[in-house]
Amino acid sequence: WYEVLSELYRTKVKTPLWPIDFFLEAYRQGIAKFLLVKHEGRIIGGSMVVADERTVYEWFECGLNAECKDQYPSVMATWGGIQLAHQSGCTRYDMMGAGEPGVPYGVRDFKAEFGGQMVEHGRFLCVCKPMLYRLGVCVVKILKNR
C-alpha cells in the first residue's frame, strides 16, 4: 500500500509524503486502521483511516486506478471506509479536504460522487518558525511545478 501511495505522491500530488515509520507507528499505537484493496492477491489500493466516537477520517487514500480501472481501487478504498464508519456506529465519514471552492480539483469531483455534504470546518495554522515555514511553502511550490 505504501508503495502505491508513494508513487501517487511522487507523480501527481507532488508533495513530500510522511516516511513509512509514521504509518507503521500510527498502526502499532492503534491510532490508524488500514483498509486494503486486493485483486488477484496484489494490493492495488487502500486507505488509512483514523476514528473517534462519531467520525471516521480518511487521512490517506490511493489506488492503481489507470492500471486496474475495472476494479475501481480508489472507489473501493473509500467505500470500505464508509462501511467501517457505518459498522462502527459513526455518523460521519470525513474525506479530509476538497480544495479551494471555484478552483477545478478532480479529487473534489471524486469525493462528490459519494453524495453527502460538503462541509468546511476550517483549518488552523500556527506557524512556530516563520522563516522555515516560508521556505517549506517555496519548496512545495517547486516540487508541484516539476
Residue positions per predicted region:
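A conserved beta-strand-loop-helix scaffold within acyl/acetyltransferase catalytic domains
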Residues: 1-70
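Alpha-helical elements of Rossmann-like donor-binding domains used by nucleotide-donor carbohydrate transfer enzymes
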Residues: 3-4, 21-22, 76-80, 106-109
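Short, charged helix-to-loop "capping" segments that act as catalytic/coupling loops
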Residues: 63-71, 97-104
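Polar/charged side chains located within well-ordered beta-strands of beta-rich proteins
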Residues: 47, 58, 78-81, 111
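Short, high-confidence coil segments that cap the C-terminus of an alpha-helix
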Residues: 32, 87-90
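Conserved acetyl-CoA-binding loop-helix of GNAT-fold acetyltransferases
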Residues: 69-85
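Active-site/acyl-donor-binding loops of N-acyltransferases
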Residues: 90-146
